């Protein structure tokens, strides 16, 4: 799923609502049969821990921890997590496990952030402009990882972006304008990331 809109349209706010980071003042948000707007603080914390993985534009890695340790620390709060080393290898970082963030490129740091989100084994992965700070080639690699995650592991991946070209990779596109959902479109034939140009 892609949430599309201009800067300041409300995309990140919607993402934060879906992730239980903000609370709605009106209406309901139903995910997987649960109305998360009715959750108390403990339920929201449990929801964020168990059901949601976050990938932000800026990676929020712990600078004094290695790539492996950055993923391991995230899974300490999860019951049904995946093996951190296996996940890092799956995103192409098997030879960078013991490197600190300062020793990694921007694309490698973003892959650590994605591995951290994947390793929690959440139902929902929320990505806020995951390619915004990356070059074209690295951005496509990151999007491919996310698309494969959705297709192969049956996870709901939500990508927030202002890049209209990315709508072609999604099965559902939500367009946001001035803090409101302008439209919800279904794409019966999403393209693979390799076919998309911007």
What are these language model-derived features?
Residues 1-176:
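ABC family nucleotide-binding domain
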Residues 172, 180-198:
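Conserved beta-strand-loop-alpha-helix hinge in the C-terminal portion
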């Amino acid at each position: 799923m892609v949430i599309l809109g201009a800067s300041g349209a409300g995309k990140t706010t919607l993402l934060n609502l879906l992730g239980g980071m903000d609370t709605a003042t009106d209406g309901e948000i139903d995910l997987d049969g649960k109305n998360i707007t009715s959750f108390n603080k403990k339920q929201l914390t449990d929801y964020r821990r168990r059901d949601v993985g976050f990938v932000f534009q800026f990676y929020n890695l712990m600078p004094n921890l290695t790539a492996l340790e950055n993923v391991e620390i995230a899974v300490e709060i999860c019951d049904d997590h995946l093996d951190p080393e296996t996940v890092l290898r799956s995103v192409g970082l098997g030879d960078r496990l013991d490197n600190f963030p300062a020793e990694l490129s921007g694309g490698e740091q973003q892959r650590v952030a994605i591995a951290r989100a994947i390793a929690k084994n959440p139902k929902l992965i929320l990505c806020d402009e995951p390619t915004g700070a990356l070059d074209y080639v690295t951005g496509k690699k990151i999007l491919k990882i996310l698309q494969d995650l959705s297709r192969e592991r049956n996870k709901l991946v939500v990508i927030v972006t202002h890049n209209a070209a990315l709508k072609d990779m999604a099965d559902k596109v939500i367009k946001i304008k001035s803090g409101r959902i302008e439209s919800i479109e279904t794409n019966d034939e999403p393209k693979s990331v390799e076919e998309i140009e911007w």
